């Protein structure tokens, strides 16, 4: 593979990728038709068979002409926009950027997993047979042919063949592929009899369909954007919970427990590195001071003692590590927390409330999940700090006699600023760190620019390391509300000084709580304005989308609905009214109210007839498939859905309801 890019271009320009399947399908259809014609009873005249053969040949000629036209226009085929479907301009974009597929049940599912042992009905997916008509091939196994799921994936075998031949004879290879595809489509045109033609074409088709090795099917289901969609999950399709806790864990508490586990592991590893470096250095300094005191006792000269004391400024204590180990340790702790949270498979491993908030604003993260994420992250950080303090308590007591009121001990679990920094500089430090973290995270998880997610943990390691190595001096780079507030609450629970935790340094505790949030929003905004191209971000929304959201929020406020409920007569929108006030409402007010969804006709003797009714799509009651047509009795929905609601509404007659927007129902005889 001397030039992979050139090989890929040659492959995309080849018409056989698109015409091969169509010619194979035509051959299958021709062979089945001719097989039926050859199996007719013997008392039929031969003229009928000849006519059928002539018709088949004519059809083949027309299909060949069409195939030739498709091949001629293949260079103008737009591979990027082949699955493009325009959406309404006022519709809010969704965070899923891959199409949804359906298997046997027919219901669309979000593409999220890799199921290596799935049983797929190839009739439902491919709408054709890729192998011999056996029961096992239809249910348990299938060849690696193009399916609905893999139709947009390149044929890797052909790709490598093109790559090997790209530097020698690319044109001859292209012509050979075209001639092979056209020869397959013309297989029935040169045959003499219909029976022989049907047997030959059927044999060739079966041989072509059995070229690929048969194996267990694998369904690739990418993630949504806020879950780093390029990393799949591997879960057997036969898996199911076998106890109550497994059911609860995989339904209600799945994402909460993932964030709890990941944040707890991150805090334990990260704070343990800081404790090891600082406590080991403190104990080493204490031992050095004891050695100096022994020199004074033995009567050493003053010059010798001064020279030994100067070593404290020249040589750093490295018994448990240095400052570089802290930055490296925190970077590794974040990556290990990411994996312990399930990576991108369960919750996306945010481990940071500011990351969750930025995904909510810029990546379509569900609002209802935010409290679970915040709770899991905060409780996980609290638990991790508490476990670590219990583990290191004896060592802390040995190194620091006043551990409960020593800021150096508290700084091993939460962050503290330099004493000479003002509140404004403290806030700006955390704001900048949070912005850089969020911009880097969006850059690493951008599906439109990040070509591979295999190196995502390594890139995240580098990002956390460079932030801690370059921005940790002033305030300690909390960058995370849970990382600072959780351990701070844990230290307060075990008896640390109240003023040291909540009062000192101009009440610094609020800075790691507010600064990372605003910084993450600003960092995500700058990245989306400059780089991001997806429609999930509000930066890339159109103006009608904003207008629709504002109008919807305005007319759905509680005061508006309460004030206009008596005047509303239509379910099409929340802001429609009756006629003008200058009309006479005497007759309307005389009508009785009804709670049914349909208006009964004034003619009691009129027989109920079936009608084709277009169900109105109402705000808050939208259906998944658009506007369905239903066949119901007259006294169910009818056209009175515009004149009556489930609550108290004025019952209108059939004539008045049929004059409304969607009241033109057609009677079925």
Swiss-Prot record:
One protein family per Pfam: MIP
Motif mapping: NPA 1: 352-354
Transmembrane regions listed in the UniProt entry: 255-275, 326-346, 370-390, 447-467, 507-527
Lineage top rank: taxon: Eukaryota
Gene3D superfamilies, per the entry: Glycerol uptake facilitator protein (1.20.1080.10)
Composition skew (Acidic residues), residue ranges: 72-81
UniProt GO BP: acetate transport; arsenite transport; conjugation with cellular fusion; glycerol metabolic process; glycerol transmembrane transport; polyol transmembrane transport; water transport
InterPro entries for this protein: Aquaporin-like, MIP, MIP/Aquaporin, MIP_CS
Motif NPA 2, chain ranges: 480-482
The name this protein goes by in its record: Glycerol uptake/efflux facilitator protein
């Amino acid at each position: 593979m001397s030039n992979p890019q050139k090989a890929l271009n040659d492959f995309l320009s080849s018409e056989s990728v698109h015409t091969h399947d169509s010619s194979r399908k035509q051959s299958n259809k021709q062979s089945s038709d001719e097989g039926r014609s050859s199996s007719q009873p013997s008392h039929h005249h031969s003229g009928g068979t000849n006519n059928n053969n002539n018709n088949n040949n004519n059809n083949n000629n027309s299909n060949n002409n069409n195939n030739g036209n498709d091949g001629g226009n293949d260079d103008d085929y737009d591979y990027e926009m082949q699955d493009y479907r325009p959406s309404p301009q006022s519709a809010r974009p969704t965070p899923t950027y891959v199409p949804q597929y359906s298997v046997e049940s027919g219901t669309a599912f979000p593409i999220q997993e890799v199921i290596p042992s799935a049983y797929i009905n190839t009739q439902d997916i491919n709408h054709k047979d890729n192998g011999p008509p056996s029961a096992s091939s239809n249910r348990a196994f299938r060849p690696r042919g193009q399916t609905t799921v893999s139709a947009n994936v390149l044929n890797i075998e052909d790709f490598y063949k093109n790559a090997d031949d790209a530097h020698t004879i690319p044109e001859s290879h292209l012509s050979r592929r075209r001639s092979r595809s056209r020869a397959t489509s013309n297989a029935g045109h040169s045959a003499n009899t219909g029976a022989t033609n049907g047997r030959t074409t059927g044999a060739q088709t079966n041989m072509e369909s059995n070229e690929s090795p048969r194996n267990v099917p694998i369904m690739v289901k990418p993630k949504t954007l806020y879950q780093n969609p390029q990393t799949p999950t591997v879960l057997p399709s036969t898996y199911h919970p076998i106890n109550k806790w497994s059911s609860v864990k995989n339904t209600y508490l799945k994402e909460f427990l993932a964030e709890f586990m990941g944040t707890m592991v991150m805090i334990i590893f990260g704070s343990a590195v800081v404790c090891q470096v600082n406590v080991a250095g403190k104990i080493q300094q204490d031992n050095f001071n004891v050695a100096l005191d022994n020199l004074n006792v033995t009567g050493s000269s003053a010059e010798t003692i001064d020279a030994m004391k100067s070593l404290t400024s020249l040589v750093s204590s490295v018994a448990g590590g240095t400052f570089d180990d802290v930055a490296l340790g925190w970077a590794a702790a974040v990556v290990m927390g990411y994996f312990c949270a399930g990576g991108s498979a369960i919750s996306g491993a945010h481990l940071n409330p500011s990351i969750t908030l930025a995904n909510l604003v810029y990546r379509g993260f569900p609002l209802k999940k935010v409290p679970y994420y915040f709770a899991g992250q905060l409780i996980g950080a609290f638990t991790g700090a508490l476990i670590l303090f219990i583990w290191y308590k004896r060592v802390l007591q040995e190194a620091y006699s006043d551990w409960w009121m020593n800021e150096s001990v508290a700084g091993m679990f939460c962050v503290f600023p330099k004493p000479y920094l003002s509140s404004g500089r403290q806030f700006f430090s955390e704001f900048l760190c949070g912005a850089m973290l969020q911009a880097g995270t969006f850059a690493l998880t951008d599906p439109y620019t990040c070509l591979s997610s295999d190196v995502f943990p390594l890139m995240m390691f580098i990002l956390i390391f460079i932030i801690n190595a370059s921005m940790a001096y002033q305030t300690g780079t909390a960058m995370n509300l849970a990382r600072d507030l959780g351990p701070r609450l844990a230290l307060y629970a075990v008896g640390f000084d109240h003023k040291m935790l909540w009062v000192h340094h101009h009440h610094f505790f609020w800075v790691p709580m507010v600064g990372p949030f605003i910084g993450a929003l600003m960092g995500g905004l700058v990245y989306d304005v400059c780089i991001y191209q997806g429609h999930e971000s509000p930066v890339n929304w159109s103006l009608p989308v904003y207008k629709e959201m504002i109008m919807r929020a305005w007319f759905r406020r509680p005061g508006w609905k309460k004030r206009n409920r008596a005047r509303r007569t239509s379910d099409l929108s929340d802001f429609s009214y009756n006629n003008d006030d200058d009309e006479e409402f005497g007759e309307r007010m005389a009508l009785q109210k009804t709670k049914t969804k349909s208006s009964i006709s004034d003619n009691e003797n009129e027989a109920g007839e079936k009608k084709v009714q277009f169900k109105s799509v109402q705000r808050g009651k939208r259906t998944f498939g658009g506007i369905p047509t239903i066949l119901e009795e007259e006294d169910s929905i009818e056209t009175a859905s515009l004149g009556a609601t489930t609550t108290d509404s004025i019952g209108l007659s059939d004539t008045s309801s049929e004059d409304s927007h969607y009241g033109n129902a057609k009677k079925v005889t």
